[in-house]
Amino acid sequence: MNNARPIRRALISVSDKTGIVEFAQALAERGVDILSTGGTARLLAEQGIAVTEVSDYTGFPEMMDGRVKTLHPKVHGGVLGRRGQDDDVMAKHGINPIDMVVVNLYPFAETVAKDGCTLADAVENIDIGGPTMVRSAAKNHKDVTIVVNASDYDRVIAEMDANDKSLTLETRFDLAIAAFEHTAAYDGMIANYFGTMVPSYGENKEGDEESKFPRTFNQQFEKKQDMRYGENSHQAAAFYVEANPQEASVSTARQIQGKALSYNNIADTDAALECVKEFNEPACVIVKHANPCGVALGKDILEAYNRAYQTDPTSAFGGIIAFNQELDAETASAIVERQFVEVIIAPSVSAEAIEVVAAKKNVRLLECGEWTTKTTGFDVKRVNGGLLVQDRDQGMVSLDDLKVVSKRQPTEEELKDALFCWKVAKYVKSNAIVYAKGDMTIGVGAGQMSRVYSAKIAGIKAADEGLEVAGSVMASDAFFPFRDGIDAAAEAGIKCVIQPGGSMRDDEVIAAADEHGMAMIFTGMRHFRH
């Protein structure tokens, strides 16, 4: 059975008018009668396109400052009417079939994002007629085409030309899915906005922590790719991204070459990229299993890479490498000649570097673009039956925030290294201990159940690679509950410790630092990472 449906009459009413004149002109040239409303109708008429105002078609004027335009049986009957089943009742009431609906919705998200947006402003940008038409057309996709995205205009015209001015059921169904996704995202935005207003009607309590989190959590993600498997080979997986993801992220990165990114590749690349963003100087971060195993700064990214690699060459094998400056040919050569690597990501990649990496065709080479702002938004963790939602950890400290609690004052170099390894510790799984000296990690102890063992592991790692711990700084993502971690660090040769403080036994821990002649710095900020 032929499931194609000819397009003879279209209703067009759009807020985003990108490409709409050209699309309407193309429809008119193919003999399609056009109904339209308000500003869209005026725009089309001004461009010489024959258009019938919906109010002229229904015999009922727009009213209430445009709140009521298309909410009429002659409109929705024409959209919802089932061809071959409702023809008699449509004819009885003078309802003409509408074969295509072209609608996008009032710019609610853009409105509420503006400074000074009031509840009244938001309310007036809640579209009523638009979603109703979209859902009506999508529901009746067996007979009606719904178009909500300007990116589909060319596709629709091309299929009409190839199919005697008709569209297939497969296309109508695909467009209907896009329509339901569109209205779901729209309603989710409205629910989120209003959900932050409670309990005080009309008052978005800026700065009130509770007001950040709506009563229901509505976010929409688009599937970017299906994967061979997930974290393990027996788990099915796919990668979803936000409709408008932030700049310079693993979600927006362009893959220049290499095999498809795996589930673990994406998770590890995200960890590496977000860590390297912390630094302004040329920096390299090497990640394995979501933990930094080597981080360093340098006069250029080649030096930064060489120093980061020295921290833990064993763990760097099969790792993810991130840079905060353009990948050049010399650095690319150093990587591919020295080690097996899964992913390399940088803001940009030179043409010469692309040629170098091409010799290793399986290496995934990504270009993420420059970043100008900190990553914002929510951090979301799935638990059985629920979500944990929090602000992203953007907390950092400066020299002015540091409190020296030991008898010995840290040297200028120790202060510099303290801030460096404090940034790194933020990205290491708790319990996290980082040893660093000269803007280079010396040892990393990650993910241990006791902090003292993380400290011991950092020392063991450094010793295994022949790196000198003496004179290094130690960062801890949380306070030391006992002095044993300080004793272990002193035994390894640590001379300065940076940590949040806040333990019931801070006095005991500080006393241990004084006994060992260490400098100890409190940040007053914790960086748990689970």
UniProtKB/Swiss-Prot annotation:
One biological process term from GO is: 'de novo' IMP biosynthetic process
Enzyme nomenclature, EC number = 2.1.2.3, 3.5.4.10
Pathway linked to the protein:
Purine metabolism; IMP biosynthesis via de novo pathway; 5-formamido-1-(5-phospho-D-ribosyl)imidazole-4-carboxamide from 5-amino-1-(5-phospho-D-ribosyl)imidazole-4-carboxamide (10-formyl THF route): step 1/1; Purine metabolism; IMP biosynthesis via de novo pathway; IMP from 5-formamido-1-(5-phospho-D-ribosyl)imidazole-4-carboxamide: step 1/1
Q: Which domain of life is it from?
A: Bacteria
**Key words, A-Z:** Hydrolase, Multifunctional enzyme, Purine biosynthesis, Transferase
What would be one Gene Ontology cellular-component term for the protein? cytosol
- Xref: InterPro entries: AICAR_Tfase_dup_dom_sf, Cytidine_deaminase-like, MGS-like_dom, MGS-like_dom_sf, PurH-like
Q: Which reaction does it catalyse?
A: (6R)-10-formyltetrahydrofolate + 5-amino-1-(5-phospho-beta-D-ribosyl)imidazole-4-carboxamide = 5-formamido-1-(5-phospho-D-ribosyl)imidazole-4-carboxamide + (6S)-5,6,7,8-tetrahydrofolate; IMP + H2O = 5-formamido-1-(5-phospho-D-ribosyl)imidazole-4-carboxamide
GO MF term (any one): IMP cyclohydrolase activity
Q: Which residues form the MGS-like domain?
A: 1-148
Q: Which SUPFAM superfamilies match?
A: Cytidine deaminase-like, Methylglyoxal synthase-like
Q: CDD domains annotated for this entry?
A: IMPCH
Family, according to the entry, reads as follows: Belongs to the PurH family.
Domain-level remarks: The IMP cyclohydrolase activity resides in the N-terminal region.
Q: What is this protein called?
A: Bifunctional purine biosynthesis protein PurH
Name the species this protein comes from: Vibrio parahaemolyticus serotype O3:K6 (strain RIMD 2210633)
What lineage does UniProt assign to this protein's organism? Bacteria, Pseudomonadati, Pseudomonadota, Gammaproteobacteria, Vibrionales
| GN (gene name) | purH
